[in-house]
Amino acid sequence: MSAAEGPLVVGVDTSTQSTKALVVDVATGEVVASGQAPHTVSSGAGRESDPRQWWDALREALHQCGDAAREAAAVSVAGQQHGLVTLDAQGAPVRPALLWNDVRSAPQARRLVEELGGPKAWAERTGSVPGPSITVTKWAWLAEHEPESVRATTAVRLPHDYLTELLTGQGTTDRGDASGTGWWASGTEAYDEEVLGHVGLDPTLLPRVVRPGEVVGTVRDSAGLPFAKGTLVAPGTGDNAAAALGLGLRPGTAVLSLGTSGTVYAVSTRRPADPTGTVAGFADARGDWLPLACTLNCTLAVDRVAALLGIDREAVEPGASVTLLPYLDGERTPALPHASGLLHGLRHDTTAGQLLQAAYDGAVHSLLGALDLVLDEDADRSAPLLLIGGGARGRAWQQTVRRLSGRAVQVPEAKELVALGAAAQAAGVLTGEDPAAVARRWNTARGPVLEVGERDEAALARIAGVISDAAPLLEREADQR
Ligand SMILES: Nc1ncnc2c1ncn2[C@@H]1O[C@H](COP(=O)(O)OP(=O)(O)O)[C@@H](O)[C@H]1O
Ligand SMILES: O=C(CO)[C@@H](O)[C@H](O)COP(=O)(O)O
């Protein structure tokens, strides 16, 4: 037996690059065991992963947790948002999942926006103007390009739903993750039958949307995982909504998450509806809202630039007037799905370290542009930004965010806030507590604060100028290059 004070729970984060599992003491928030196993994502035109890998990675991550996982009384799975998982009558994937950062459905997104009333109508209806990340556009792409896959599909799931169903045998999802599909109406909090009819998706193929705090089932014996009989399963949610739980986030505090995706978000009590499409009007996992902007190019893109230059990711140098837009995967914020990376202002005396700093600046610029938009008007804009995700460990990321935001930056010591949020949700179904209150009790946001500095307006203006001047290049579709 572990020396934990309270019951134990397991929180899972199945994100783009890996699945992580934490075993957490409900009384103290102490992480008593952890595990992590990688996934692979296809390269080339699309971004796909075989969902069976996520299950194998979950088993491996739990195996690494050892006996502590066997003692867990509840588990919850948080996962990368938006991925389209199509299952056949046996529950097996019909094809690999189309991930959030697959931009092939950009034409379908454009068409759907036009056909169903334009950007404002979509924002009011679903909270978001669908771009290629949003699941409904992926379903429309599949219907057009692989009608045989659509015909073979008897269930449609998101990544966290897929794993939760393998645990419980029940097809369920939650409002946080459902709000990223484009077929969930944020006004009524129900599936939008008109949108579904428009794309030919039968609503009976979708999972039941459970209430926050509902126990969705218990772990099946047949799951073959190291859980005791009767282990409760919590609803789970999308990874950003889980991190908001994991931070015990209150309205008015902004979060910047630096992982495969870059995201900026805040909790709001007001239902968002941004007709420009910059802010996605997601629901959170508790009953509030999570206005969020997301970039496709964050840590992987900057690490790629460092690798190309042959230098360490921390080997940045200041003082350049070079601009690097690191849109290696196309971009979502700004909405440039067909863009590629762009370099401007290179001189004989530009150093490799300056080029790398320019890549950090380009990545952070996109996120900061949306910062004010995700915060309510009455938010305290002098409060520190919370910096999380794998990139938050890096000094170059921390200093870039501090310099370009002109805000104080707080870096929580807790490393895995998505998995911690899932653990807080699992604790909530066990004790009846609000998961965000659990996380506050665990003091998960604790960490050093980098003091406020002067905002680098010159760099911000230079980057904005290049984006604007290069618009025709950045907007050009791949086959026009
Ligand atoms: N010390 C560090 N400094 C900078 N970046 C880091 C550091 N540690 C990890 N990373 C970056 O974090 C990323 C993984 O972050 P994570 O939030 O786990 O991603 P995801 O949840 O999207 O799978 C990797 O791409 C890696 O480049
Ligand atoms: O698409 C979004 C948010 O809308 C992404 O944030 C995904 O949820 C993937 O997250 P990570 O794997 O980068 O954590």
List where the protein language model places each region.
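N-terminal glycine/serine-rich phosphate-binding loop of ATP-dependent small-molecule kinases
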Residues: 1-96, 124, 152, 227-232, ...
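Active-site core segments that coordinate phosphate-bearing ligands/cofactors
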Residues: 10-12, 106, 113-126, 134-136, ...
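Short beta-strand-loop/turn "lid" adjacent to the catalytic site in phosphate-handling enzymes
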Residues: 63, 67-100, 126-133, 160, ...
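Extracytoplasmic ligand-binding clamshell segments of periplasmic binding protein
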Residues: 205, 211, 240
